Design a protein with these regions (language model features):
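Structural beta-strand/beta-sheet cores of well-ordered domains, especially the beta-sheet scaffolds
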Residues: 51, 130-132, 159-162, 196-198
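Long, highly charged, low-complexity intrinsically disordered interaction regions
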Residues: 174-205
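Long, internal scaffold/assembly segments composed of regular secondary structure
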Residues: 145-169, 174
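Conserved Radical SAM active-site core
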Residues: 1-134, 139-142, 155, 170-182
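Alpha-helix capping/termination and helix-coil
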Residues: 111, 115, 159, 197-204
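Amphipathic alpha-helical transducer elements in NTP-driven molecular machines
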Residues: 97-101, 145, 149, 190-193
Length: 205
């Protein structure tokens, strides 16, 4: 409720136009998502918040909770973070490819169904009308740009993503599995990936 009150206060003062809601995992994906849903419910139903909401769907969350989240948010995102299964196994062994792709497929299918339902009835509930997106970290692993762009194209085609965002890895700790702390963030590489992404989305390269 505190976050909902803070958001509506800023919104009414025209400080913000929307909310991006994300969270680390507290206790479990379902418990965390339930708290996110309650925050959005208060905003939408009690405060009549009509601003834009982008919510993060946490891998491992039950389909029922992803459904409820999508009915309250304009856009959902399931962040892949690391662009290969090898990278996930090395740096995030608690995550799996299937746990990430499963909610992506659900969001894709449910958004398609929602559009079809709206054709039949304008009063049908709307599910994530602004679609879904994801984020990839660039430079934390040895994955090259060819691999990243192949993955990006596959995500656009198979999961109907609206955007893939790229984030240059910034070293903050010394770890033998990661680039050293004196490694500069690959900002130019990030920029070039955004340029290539533009060509994929708008020109079909």
């Amino acid at each position: 409720r505190e976050l909902a009150e803070l958001t509506i206060g800023f919104y009414r003062r025209n400080y913000i136009e929307g909310l991006f809601l994300s969270s680390g995992v507290l206790r479990s994906p379902d418990y965390t998502t339930e708290r996110m849903i309650e925050c959005l419910r208060i905003l939408r139903e009690e405060y009549r918040f009509n601003g834009y909401i982008h919510a993060k769907a946490i891998p491992g969350t039950s389909p029922e909770l992803v459904q409820r989240l999508g009915l309250l948010a304009d856009r959902l995102s399931v962040n892949i973070e690391l662009p290969s299964q090898k990278g996930l196994q090395t740096l995030a062994p608690d995550k799996s490819k299937q746990a990430i792709l499963r909610p992506m497929a659900q969001i894709r299918d449910r958004a398609r169904e929602s559009k079809a339902e709206l054709v039949k009835s304008h009063h049908a509930p709307v599910f994530a009308p602004a679609g879904q997106s994801t984020q990839l970290i660039v430079g934390a692993t040895a994955d090259n740009d060819r691999h990243i762009l192949h993955l990006t194209q596959s995500l656009y085609e198979k999961y109907r993503l609206k955007r893939v965002f790229y984030s240059a890895y910034v070293p903050v700790v010394e770890n033998s599995l990661l680039p050293s702390k004196d490694t500069k963030p690959p900002l130019l590489r990030e920029h070039r990936l955004y340029q290539a992404d533009w060509l994929l989305r708008f020109y079909g390269f």
